[in-house]
């Protein structure tokens, strides 16, 4: 039988908070039985395992670090986001996650945060989480603010980018915390569009990011301990059997089909950048004036079922403004975060004068 739904035997260890008062809540910290560094995909699978198998009303949290890796969003096309040749030449691994959002570089000087909650409202959960992390940073006298779609900023520069997705009965939020990083690798591996950089008011990736080490005297390990002590009030340690179950889940993340994603044929491409939504690219296959396939790429965030809500109703319909408008739901923002029906219609069909949907 699959380990996917394995029932865990867990050891509860109450975290020591003798040096710090717990500031922000009573999350459970989830630890591994050993401290070895694992593949990035393992930690993504660990999030799923925790969500599906740890039976607690409390939220769960853990931190992790990886060897140089690139991780891109569920709806992104790898060749649009990553310098694949540089990654291969420098042994930088590439992974796809199940959440939306953009592409990030991670290494051992960059801390990754994972947060798992029973909350069903992913948008509300997301906002609450990034504000909690920003508040924790401010407790260290770091002028951090939760801004934009998914970022935590210091003086207008990003120190943390986050993404989220939903599985039955749980929401998962994960993100970066830039303590330090190999700037050469970050700049060389990521290939954001000129439009994305301009929208941030910068000319390069380096201009857009902040590093925690420039704002605090704590070492990386000291910062991790401070975070754990102040966000969590208890701790569990997974078992060896749990590790086997996580590795079973991880297999999906390692398949070429999952990493490369689907890239169906297309005859028409429309691109837009929408404030509060992200960069979007619609690829449609139109034959005889009829929509045969639709693929919406980008760093947007899904909060609903895009296939059932948006794509399936379009397939087989004539490619014209009226049929697109009639096929789309009235509240597309319930599927793609912050994207209204007018904007989605424009993405699919192109900008029209006096467009009414």
Give the label of every model feature segment.
Residues 24-78, 164, 209-279, 283, ...:
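Active-site loop/lid in soluble adenylation, ligation, and acyl-transfer enzymes
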Residues 98-117, 195-213:
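Residues forming anionic-ligand binding surfaces in small-molecule and nucleic-acid pockets
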Residues 142-155, 238-245:
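Short, surface-exposed recognition loops or helix-turn segments adjacent to catalytic cores
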Residues 4, 11-13, 22:
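Short, positively charged and aromatic/hydrophobic N-terminal segments
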Residues 81-103:
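Active-site cofactor/substrate anionic-group-binding motifs, chiefly glycine-
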Residues 133, 160, 168-262, 308-357:
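Long, positively charged amphipathic alpha-helical accessory segments at protein N-termini or as interdomain linkers
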Residues 110-150:
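Contiguous, small/hydrophobic- and glycine-enriched helical/loop subdomains that border
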Residues 163-164, 177, 280-300:
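Short beta-strand elements
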